[in-house]
Regions:
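Short histidine/acidic/glycine/proline-rich micro-motifs that form metal-
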Residues: 69-71, 118-123
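Short, acidic/small-residue loops that bind anionic groups at enzyme active sites
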Residues: 85-100, 141-147
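Structural motif
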Residues: 6-10, 117-120, 150-152
Length: 160
């Protein structure tokens, strides 16, 4: 099984042959909104700082995110990554599900597991955090997304 790991948590042991995108170590440029990924070079961002990640993500069977919560929401680094994943989708939208969604560019996307850590101001804030992530991956045409606190990963020993 090919796995890609996206992490902003330092305490996770990840096997050596897994592609790792360390959001704490890698400087990722914000999306410029230039639309090059849709018009000039379809499917390819004008910035090249994530080319290796894009390839690994699209070739993976599973993408595992180890993330932190910041002020009851995802970090700015993770939000930037989500924004920069738009080249994986077509500029056209569909109303097939009763809501506007970009069409997939590729036939297959990896399953996703998200393990998060951080304190929340309330249980409803934690629930909203999980719902936001579920919606992101739904919009990304991810067929299977699991979202759990980091303790869920440590307890179930997910095979990477």
């Amino acid at each position: 099984m090919r796995t890609v790991v996206i992490s902003e948590v330092d305490s996770i042991h990840i096997p050596g042959n897994t592609f790792i995108l360390d959001l704490n170590a890698r400087a990722i440029k914000d999306c410029a909104g230039c639309w090059s990924c849709w018009q000039k070079t379809p499917g390819r961002c004008a910035f090249k700082d994530l080319d290796d990640f894009y390839t690994a993500f699209l070739q993976a069977d599973k993408a595992v995110f180890f993330i932190g919560a910041s002020c009851d929401f995802v970090s700015g680094r993770l939000k930037t990554l989500f924004d920069r994943m738009i080249p994986h989708y077509l500029p056209y939208t569909s109303w097939k599900t009763g809501e506007s969604m970009h069409l997939p560019r590729y036939e297959r996307y990896p399953d996703v597991e998200v393990y998060y850590q951080g304190a929340f101001s309330s249980e409803s804030a934690r629930h909203l955090f999980e719902e936001y992530l579920a919606r992101v991956f739904y919009q990304f045409h991810i067929k299977r997304a699991v979202i759990k606190p980091l303790g869920g990963y440590e307890q179930c020993e997910v095979a990477i």
